[in-house]
Amino acid sequence: MMYYLYSHAGINIFQYITFRAGAAFFIAFFLALLFMPRFIQWARNQKAAQPISEFAPQGHRGKANTPTMGGLVFIGATLLASLLCAKLNNLYVLAGLAVILLFGLIGLRDDAVKVLNHSNAGLSSRVKMLYLVLAGASVSAALFYFGMEDDLYIPFNKNPLLSMGIVAILFWTLVMVATSNAVNITDGLDGLATVPSVYALVSLSVFVYIAGHAGLSSYLLWPKITDSGEAVIVSAALVGALIGFLWFNCHPAQLFMGDSGSLSIGGFIAYMAIISKNEFLLFLIGSIFVIETVSVILQIGSYKTRGKRIFLMAPIHHHFEVKGWAETKIIVRFWIIALMSNIIALLTLKVR
């Protein structure tokens, strides 16, 4: 809507992505601050709290009545801010909003099952995976159909490794499903997934803006993805909404994001990596998500093959809890790792 004040009323400042991204950030931030307390009160009245797993560390027992599904609020804030500030006829805006909405709805279904059944077990892993694959494949197929570049790039190389063709749909789907699950796994402590997600989105927004800017992409030898820069507005809105959510999610959390939040965040982070041609650099940008996921894979693999556990508990943040680390210490140290990883990722811009 804001862009059309430029195209129809001639208000020049509204043509700039940077201005509209800033506006989207603050709109989403204040919407989250405004509606989050109301949602918390409503969720408490409805007893919409996710039951704590019997296998969780002892310290988690005190979180038993904390409301969940906070993702609904920051998804809503993101969508509204994006609708107000972004060009709604842009492929990359529409696809990004579709990712947030589809993955958020899958997470909402999972959250609802947990709350209604008073159980930590939501949708079966097979059903949830099927939904995620269908959502990821739908968006990936749309991107491919409408001409999204299918070249695969690796860090530090200005030339594409190969052209994936229709296989790009499978690859992009894999990236979205894997990343959404990785963020979901990480979301186990207050604010642990929120801040690394903000770092990742900020870094990826820089890459997407460069990819959509003819001058910058040429200067930095970065793949040019025409019109992709508009997706930065959606990303800025999500960052603003997440910071508003963090106000209530920091330790001790008044609200959890739930699967509705973590799956939508993970799906959108993957989407931003895909349209900026950073699928492999995502391992560095999302280092905390990778570490958490690998710890689970190693734990399961070791137990099934050797009958022994590598960690005291997985994901690895629980390992440190069992070792006696304070929750806040684990969270802040993981934030530091995420910050350093994203700084390094941004430095790769000049290494081509």
UniProtKB/Swiss-Prot annotation:
Pfam families: Glycos_transf_4 (PF00953), MraY_sig1 (PF10555). Pathway: Cell wall biogenesis; peptidoglycan biosynthesis. InterPro entries: Glycosyl_transferase_4, PNAcMuramoyl-5peptid_Trfase, PNAcMuramoyl-5peptid_Trfase_CS. It catalyses: UDP-N-acetyl-alpha-D-muramoyl-L-alanyl-gamma-D-glutamyl-meso-2,6-diaminopimeloyl-D-alanyl-D-alanine + di-trans,octa-cis-undecaprenyl phosphate = di-trans,octa-cis-undecaprenyl diphospho-N-acetyl-alpha-D-muramoyl-L-alanyl-D-glutamyl-meso-2,6-diaminopimeloyl-D-alanyl-D-alanine + UMP. It comes from the Bacteria. One of its GO terms (cellular component) is plasma membrane. One of its GO terms (molecular function) is UDP-N-acetylmuramoyl-L-alanyl-D-glutamyl-meso-2,6-diaminopimelyl-D-alanyl-D-alanine:undecaprenyl-phosphate transferase activity. Its EC number is 2.7.8.13. It is a multi-pass membrane protein. Its cofactor is Mg(2+). The keyword Protein biosynthesis does not apply. The keyword Lyase does not apply. Keywords: Cell cycle, Cell division, Cell inner membrane, Cell membrane, Cell shape, Cell wall biogenesis/degradation, Magnesium, Membrane, Metal-binding, Peptidoglycan synthesis, Transferase, Transmembrane, Transmembrane helix. Coiled coil: none annotated. The chain crosses the membrane at residues 16-36, 66-86, 88-108, 129-149, 160-180, 191-211, 228-248, 255-275, 280-300, 329-349. GO terms for biological process: cell division; cell wall organization; peptidoglycan biosynthetic process; regulation of cell shape. It is found in: Cell inner membrane. Catalyzes the initial step of the lipid cycle reactions in the biosynthesis of the cell wall peptidoglycan: transfers peptidoglycan precursor phospho-MurNAc-pentapeptide from UDP-MurNAc-pentapeptide onto the lipid carrier undecaprenyl phosphate, yielding undecaprenyl-pyrophosphoryl-MurNAc-pentapeptide, known as lipid I. Belongs to the glycosyltransferase 4 family. MraY subfamily. PANTHER family: PHOSPHO-N-ACETYLMURAMOYL-PENTAPEPTIDE-TRANSFERASE, PHOSPHO-N-ACETYLMURAMOYL-PENTAPEPTIDE-TRANSFERASE HOMOLOG. This is Phospho-N-acetylmuramoyl-pentapeptide-transferase. It comes from Wolinella succinogenes (strain ATCC 29543 / DSM 1740 / CCUG 13145 / JCM 31913 / LMG 7466 / NCTC 11488 / FDC 602W) (Vibrio succinogenes).
